[in-house]
Each structure stands twice: as C-alpha cells, then as structure tokens.
Amino acid sequence: KVNHPIKYAWYDAMTYKYGRYHEDGLGDYNYQFMQKEGDKVPADQFFANFNWNKEKNDHSVEMAKWLERSQYDVFAGLELQQGGSYKTKVKWDALLDEKGKLRLSLGLFAPDTITSLGKTGEDYHKNEDIFFTGYQGDPTAQKPADKEWYGIANLVADRTPAVGRTFTTSFNTGHGRKWFVDGKVSKDSEWNYRSVSGVLPTWRWWQTSTGEKLRAEYDFTDAYNGGNSLKFSGDVAGKTDQDVNLYSTKLEVTEKTKLRVAHKGGKGSKVYMAFSTTPDYKFEDAAAWKELTLSDDWKNEEFDLSSLAGKTIYAVKLFFEHEGAVKDYQFNLGQLTITDNHQAPQAPTGLSVVKQSLKNAQEAEAVVQFSGNQDADFYEVYEKDGDNWRLLTGSSASTIYLPKVSRSANATGTTQELKVVAVGKNGLRSEAATASFNWGMTVQDTTLPRPLAENIVPGATVIGSTFPNTEGGEGIEGMLNGTITSLSDKWSSGQLSGSVDIRLT
C-alpha cells in the first residue's frame, strides 16, 4: 500500500508441482519460483537448503543463467544453529571458484547462535569478530591453515551506512555496565538498550604494524558517551607504527565540515586521525591527516576540514607513531563525528507521564511520551534525585517505558522531576524537556519490601544425558534456563526424546 521495497525470498522446501522436497539448490523442480513473468519475478531471492555440494551448486549457477537471473540471487544456506556459529563445517570448495570468489551468495541461518558461545558481553564481541572477520582478525588476510572458518568479511565486500554529509558514532554496542555522558558516569549499573546502538567499526580489526600489533577491543569500563569506547593497548617497541583501519565511508566534505574526536590516553606516542579521499583506501592526502593532542583525561577536539571541500572521505583510520618503547600503552577513542551541521537538535516537546504504577513510595514504573524531531538519533531520559540527574534509559522511540523510576530515602515532597534530551545525528545534545512525576505520597508513607530471592539455580549442572553431545554452541547444558552457562538458554538436538540428569545445589 505504501510501496515499500519488500524483498521476497523462497526457501528450498517445496517443488512447483510435486509437494515438499529439498533440491538443495535451484533445480528442475523449483525453478518456476525464480522464473520471470514479464518484468516481474515471483521471488527476489532463493534460499538453498543446507545439503548442497559442488554438483548442486554448479546446477544452481547454470539454472540461474538459463532463467536470466543473477547467480547471486541464489543463497547457499549455512546451518549455523546446529553447527555452532563459526564452528560449522562448511564445504568451502563447493562455494568458491578458482580465484577464491563466491559462486553463490551466503544464506546465514541463525547467525545469532554467536550468543551461545560466551558468558559475557566481551565474550560475545570476541566471538562475533571471529564469525565475521575470522580467526586472523583481518578481512584482507587468509584464514589460518589450521582453521576451517573463513570469516564472512573475507568473502563479501564491505558496505557502509556512513554516507552523506554527517556521521557520528560513540561506538555504542547497545549494552554496558555504566552509561557515560561526556566522560562522566550518569548510570552506574548494567543496561541493555539496543535501539541506541551506534555504527561500529567496519573492520574489526584491520591492522598493519612495523612491530607488534596493538590489542583492539571494546572497553566497557570507560567511555565518553554511552556504554563503551574503543581501546587500543599493549607493550609497544620504539621506532614502530600502527595502522588501524576503522571505517569504510562515503562522506561528502563541504566548506563547513568539521571533525570532532573524543579521546583519552596515548601519551608516549603520536596519534593521528586520517582519511582516505580516494576509493582505493589510500591515505596519501596530507591535508587529511590530523594529529591529536593527547591527554590523560577525556578530551574533545575539533578540526576544520574545509581544505578537503569538494572531496569524498572513503575511509577513516587511526595511525600510531611510537618513537620510544612504551609499556602498558593505552589509547581510548570515545566519539567520532564528521559533519557540516553544527546545530544542536530542537528539544523534545509535550513531555508527559501517560501511565504510572507505584510499587512503593520510592519505586515505580511509568510510560513517558513526547514529540521528537527528525534531527534526533535517540533520546536520553533522566530522573532528578536531590541535586543530581540520573539516566533512566536511552531509546530511539518517543513513547518510552521506564521500568524503574526511583528516589532516595531522603527525598522530600510528593513529586519528582524527569527530563528528556535529544541526541542529534551530529552527536550534539538538545535542551531538555521536563515533566513532573507525581508520586502522590512522601517517601515516609511506605516501607521498602524485602527483595525477593532471584529465581535461578546458578550451581545446577547437567551431569548426564541420553542426548548426544553437539559440536555446536547450543548443547544440552543450555536447557537449564536461568543458569549461568552462556548468553543463550537454547539447546538443539535432532533426537526426539531422551532423559537428562541434573545436579542441583
């Protein structure tokens, strides 16, 4: 009805005439789902079932050509859930041509299986890097000889959302242990707000070095805005340098374009932010190199990029130059902004508490609503407790559920102030919209209930089972919902029934 460009994919499970059947590719009994009818096609993409091989892939390529369709409209399915993400056995020889190029597209079934391979957020990102970049941690390098997994970035060219004339990122992964605002802690507890995730580095991590490479990772203990920064650390030798390629971009530079960089640490070296103004990712334009003024505390620097007006920034990197050796070297990158829009977004309007539910005189749930604006990337909601503002949540929505509004035992009166700030697509914050939360009572009017014990059995273990062990990440131990075995509480088995022995604590 709104003419949204929806893409339709056909899963290789049905034939055109004879019912259910997996051909494991585009074949003689299912090609009709991809056959053109004038200028239209029944399906935009074809997802081949997982049991393909070289012969079946050859036939898929030939069938696509016969149908005058691209062979890359056919996706070779990878069963990542049962296989265990990057532990999945893949018949790469059946997928790659003599030049190492994919012959079909990749269809990733359940790539979120990564979550089952670790116990912490840091574990997740390490496994995510292996899945997408490979064990070698470099999309330009071949996989190690003793490993089977290539890494998706080794096979598929990079694409980027960093286009136009404005790009900003705080490298926010959408979760954290604290929330920082301009380098200061505003929420001192764990959170998970996926809608405020930032654009993460395109290449994690594409590095070259004349010495040992720096260790690159997300730092959840210190950030400039949001929950994490990028940390580069290690022992460095003198007379060495490091190239860390961060982003593929396509950013237009005007006379008003400026660079803002928030960073911390790095003393004992020279650190540059550099841009490639050619599509080949070469950094040969001297005007596109900006040396940072290093500081032990968070520093937000601004650079004029008008000398690059009329050019396009195709890539962004960090360059470290070490004259002398430094032990325990560390540099944190907290925020990166390239924009010619230096106007803060308009403040939200019409902020109100549309629903609330009191648990006691100090804790409540609520829903706030307001009118936002198109210049906002997301919104931060705060509560005032005494003289301090404390972050409640971050969200890209304009109707926001607040699971825990709270005030301290020494709060006075029956109302509490809330505020909402818009964070712009250029990284700037708006003025605040405020509203009053009416408790209808003072903190002395109720007592706090005794906290309920958590409904988990952290020491429970699976000690035996008639289900077979799985090579994937979703083994039988994952059936213990609520136990701390991984980031996933799913398990998978092809066996229809069986028994499990569990030891409780």
Language-model features: where?
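Beta-strand-rich modules
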Residues: 403-430
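Extracellular fibronectin type III
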Residues: 426-442
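Extracellular beta-strand ligand-recognition surfaces/modules
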Residues: 261, 299-336, 505
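Disordered, acidic Ser/Thr/Pro-rich linker "stalks" and the adjacent N-terminal cap
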Residues: 441-504
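Substrate-binding cleft of secreted/luminal carbohydrate-active enzymes
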Residues: 74, 78-215
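Conserved aromatic anchor
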Residues: 362-375
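Extra-cytoplasmic beta-strand recognition segments
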Residues: 230, 242-271, 301-305, 336, ...
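Short carbohydrate-recognition loop motifs
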Residues: 215-242, 489
